[in-house]
Amino acid sequence: MIISKCIDEKHIYTAWRENGERQFKLEAFEPYFFIEDDEFQFENYTVNKYISRPFKYEKGEWLSLKGKPLKKVIVEQATDIYKARKMWNKTYEADVPFGFRYAIDKLEELPEFKLRKWYWDMEWQQGGEHHDKITVIVAYDNYDKEYYQWAWFPNYDGDKELFFDNEKDMIESFIQCMIDKDPDMLIAWFGLKFDLPKLLDRCCALGINPMRMSPINRIEGVKKAGNGHTFSKAESGFSPIQQPLGGRITLNLDLAFERQWNDSQRGTLPSMSLEYVSQTLFGEGKSKETKFEDPNEFYRRGWLEDTEAYLKYALVDVELLVRIDETNFCSEAIVALQRLLVAPFEACFYASHMGSIYFMRNADWICKTGSKVDKREEYEGAMIYDPLSENTNGLHLNVAAFDFAGLYPSMMISRNISWETKSEEPTEFGCDIATPRDFSEATRTHMLYYKTDKLGLLPRAVLELKDLRNEYKRLMRDAREAGDDLEVVKWHNNQMAVKRLMASFYGIVAFQGFGWADVNLAASITASAREAIRLAAFKAKEMEV
């Protein structure tokens, strides 16, 4: 589902499909954060030296983690929060992105539908008279299952559809096709870094209105200027998860594939180039049929001097994108995670985003606003031991492997480790955070305790998600037995989405400076894991083999 903030920072646009047709909703939504109930209520806040706006306040039953009553502070625009929150020393959830806030408050589930996807790529001239001009654009539409190739050539007088004699007409045709086809998702390889910024930059240079590509007339970095537009991100590009094109999802397929590859524990890829990934997956890469032996010469001269090879090169790049995604289900895996989180698409990549969305939905308290950490607080991490000091080096026969299933999540459950379950009194759920990181004898203790009377948010979330993942795995097995390949893929993606979400939980408590971060929780989790590994190792040493 598409969840985009509008240019006025007051409305949210959501879009989905019913029977293949796009449906949308435009909804006003007030941006807000929280302060403690006894804090002073300022009447206005300053946006800049010319503009000030009134605050609105709302009383409710909101509480902080420590049980302090809170009240809501409402501002006019989402971008106002950054300055408005500085009027108080302590705020709560003042760092939640506007789209995240809307999804948490307004959405309970996301509709399941087939997204219309465009896989696309561009080539632009390197050197010469037409340096930096876009020469070819290729797109594949997964609804009509067609490849489209736009190109232009100086003095072109042919009649081939989508071929032009100038760059401007070619780009205008591409944009009009985007408007007509109305794709939900644009998928490219490093497209947010290179292709989309280049397209927007050339639009502005040629006097083309790039805003037409956005159903809600919002593109980050693009501003109206006189009779045209300017673009401020031509050099830097966008971040890999950014959603700059309001009303459409943009996906860097390289990022989605890399995450999936790493999840499968197949090792680190030495290169994320499309050529290397394609060779690794399929044993074949980009088209290299050209009269130029030097690739740089091909990029510089191929457009006009080896046109057929140049056009094929551009087409094959998009064919590879389609093949990578349709054989590995990279984009659908992220869509499955989005439906699980009930969140904007950009929330589905980093642990801090995934975890915070989930916890804000399920906590019965309001989290403090994150703050910059000048110096990280150190704590002991995972086990590290030296085979020489442990006398385990050498040849071993009759070796058995032992592994914990979900070690860190299991420790959260076993010790009831959570923000609200900390105990100042000793309990059965004690964690010795001084547990050694090797198999040496413990020489000191430093105990942290957790309550036993009520299951905490963190272990409760793990247990609920484990049950959900097991259910998805069961449905996947049923689909496999029924020979329904599409359902197998669907439930595999869903169970992997749950796995990724659970894996984010440790990362979020260890991410210092973030609102949900807590060093004591992180230290308790890693210490409990070390204790479990040490106990297993000591038991193994007692065995006679």
Where are these regions (language model features)?
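DnaQ-like (DEDDh/DEDDy) 3′-5′ exonuclease domain used for proofreading
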Residues: 1-182, 204, 316, 320-339, ...
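Conserved catalytic core of nucleic-acid polymerases
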Residues: 97-99, 404-407, 413, 417-418, ...
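Proline-aspartate-enriched helix->loop->beta-strand connector
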Residues: 174-199
